[in-house]
């Protein structure tokens, strides 16, 4: 009896996937509004998926003058709970705690990192402790957690840095082949909020275009949801 039920569930699940995929046409280009609507209607998973963006840039990320990297404060947030660690001198620890940091300290946090215990999503540091943090740069760097003044995570303004991290600040960085990938909120967000996040992110990446770049900068753009369909964006619809 249980086998029949399992088969019925699998058939039902497969049907939902097929029906969802039929709502998105692989040979069609969508504007942002239509893309969000399609992805919502095509989602079949039982959890709240993330809206993801992939941008293909006409850069060669092997050249230092063509690096595209930065942060964006998403107007509607990410929908995720962000754990923030602040590494600073003892006299500023209380300030960091009051501002909402989840982990605060100096050598204690660095020792935990060395031991492989990384229980945070963002690491913020004051300039006066960066020399000490250098000892774990090879651990934090590959994970995208190394504090960086260009990203606002090496700063004297601890309070504002924590606020930005908690409220929906997203880092972007062009990887090999000029690909940028980021999550921009939950599919349960209103269409308006998702579009606000999308427009803010796209605008930031476009503004980050390397000054000396020749040729087309934005080559292709795709939106998708976690375990869901993917749609290609009509670049002529991007203002």
UniProtKB/Swiss-Prot annotation:
InterPro entries: Ribosom_uL1_bac-type, Ribosomal_uL1, Ribosomal_uL1-like, Ribosomal_uL1/biogenesis, Ribosomal_uL1_3-a/b-sand, Ribosomal_uL1_CS. Part of the 50S ribosomal subunit. Binds directly to 23S rRNA. The L1 stalk is quite mobile in the ribosome, and is involved in E site tRNA release. One of its GO terms (molecular function) is tRNA binding. It comes from the Bacteria. This is Large ribosomal subunit protein uL1. Keywords: Repressor, Ribonucleoprotein, Ribosomal protein, RNA-binding, rRNA-binding, Translation regulation, tRNA-binding. The keyword Repressor applies. GO terms for cellular component: large ribosomal subunit. The keyword Metal-binding does not apply. One of its GO terms (biological process) is regulation of translation. It comes from Rickettsia rickettsii (strain Sheila Smith). HAMAP family: Ribosomal_uL1_B. Belongs to the universal ribosomal protein uL1 family.
